[in-house]
């Protein structure tokens, strides 16, 4: 096992413990508490994958952090913080929308890289909007916290969430997972739109219907589907 993987996990465990103490003293805001819950699930998954005990890892992580802080001067710390880019946390959904339980009549689940896509295939002929809570850095989506698909009535019919056992994902991973979700929902004649916030930071552009632009792969797939439909119609005639 890569020692850097182990030490990274140990430090993450200790830093989560520190953040938990902040939350226990009621010093964290809603985004802070949201990330805390998500990171807890991620650490449990990583611990299971690595075969490491979280409590033991937290103690070792504390030693690593204390050693670094002891060796680092205040001036070096100030320079590091000044040069580090700051990320922003953006929210399409309220805490209630993020934490609400939902169920599927015809469940479908697919793993798209480090992300899990879930949707209800029983939903048909609905207008659906995708909302997400995520962090942004350099005006690009950095980390997806949670994405959910809502009908006009407010019902949740789909979701994309990071897999706890596979931490870390890219902007492209998120776009691919959204493509899977949109494709699954549109298969049943639903009309899907993406929130303006998600359009801006995931794609930086969209068409007039609020849809993200199709990738070359998606365009080729659509062209094949259209050609196939045309051939079937000619044979029927």
Swiss-Prot record:
Keywords: Eukaryotic host gene expression shutoff by virus, Host cytoplasm, Host gene expression shutoff by virus, Host mRNA suppression by virus, Host nucleus, Host-virus interaction, Inhibition of host innate immune response by virus, Inhibition of host interferon signaling pathway by virus, Inhibition of host PKR by virus, Inhibition of host pre-mRNA processing by virus, Inhibition of host RIG-I by virus, Inhibition of host RLR pathway by virus, Interferon antiviral system evasion, RNA-binding, Ubl conjugation, Viral immunoevasion. Its main location: host cell. It holds the Pfam family Flu_NS1. Coiled coil: none annotated. GO terms for cellular component: host cell cytoplasm; host cell nucleus. Upon interferon induction, ISGylated via host HERC5; this results in the impairment of NS1 interaction with RNA targets due to its inability to form homodimers and to interact with host EIF2AK2/PKR. The keyword tRNA processing does not apply. Residues 1-73 are annotated as: RNA-binding and homodimerization. It is found in: Host nucleus; Host cytoplasm. Residues 205-237 are annotated as: Disordered. Belongs to the influenza A viruses NS1 family. The dsRNA-binding region is required for suppression of RNA silencing. This is Non-structural protein 1. It comes from Influenza A virus (strain A/Chile/1/1983 H1N1).
């Amino acid at each position: 096992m890569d020692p850097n993987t182990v030490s990274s996990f140990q430090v993450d465990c200790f830093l989560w413990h520190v953040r938990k103490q902040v939350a226990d003293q009621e010093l964290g805001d809603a985004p802070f508490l949201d990330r805390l819950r998500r990171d807890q699930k991620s650490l449990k998954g990583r611990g299971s994958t690595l075969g490491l005990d979280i409590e033991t890892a937290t103690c070792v992580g504390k030693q690593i952090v204390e050693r670094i802080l002891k060796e680092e001067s205040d001036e070096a710390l100030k320079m590091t913080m000044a040069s580090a880019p700051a990320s922003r946390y953006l929210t399409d959904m309220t805490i209630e929308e993020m934490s609400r339980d939902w169920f599927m009549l015809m469940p479908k689940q697919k793993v798209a890289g480090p992300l899990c896509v879930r949707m209800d295939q029983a939903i048909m002929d609905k207008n659906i909007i995708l909302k997400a809570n995520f962090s942004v850095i350099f005006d690009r989506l950095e980390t997806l916290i949670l994405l959910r698909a809502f009908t006009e009535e407010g019902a949740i019919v789909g979701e994309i969430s990071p897999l706890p056992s596979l931490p870390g994902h890219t902007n492209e991973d998120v776009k691919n997972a959204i493509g899977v979700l949109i494709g699954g929902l549109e298969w049943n004649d639903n009309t899907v739109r993406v929130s303006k916030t998600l359009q801006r930071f995931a794609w930086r552009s969209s068409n007039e219907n609020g849809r993200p632009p199709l990738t070359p792969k998606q365009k080729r797939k659509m062209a094949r589907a259209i050609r196939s439909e045309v051939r079937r119609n000619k044979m029927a005639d």
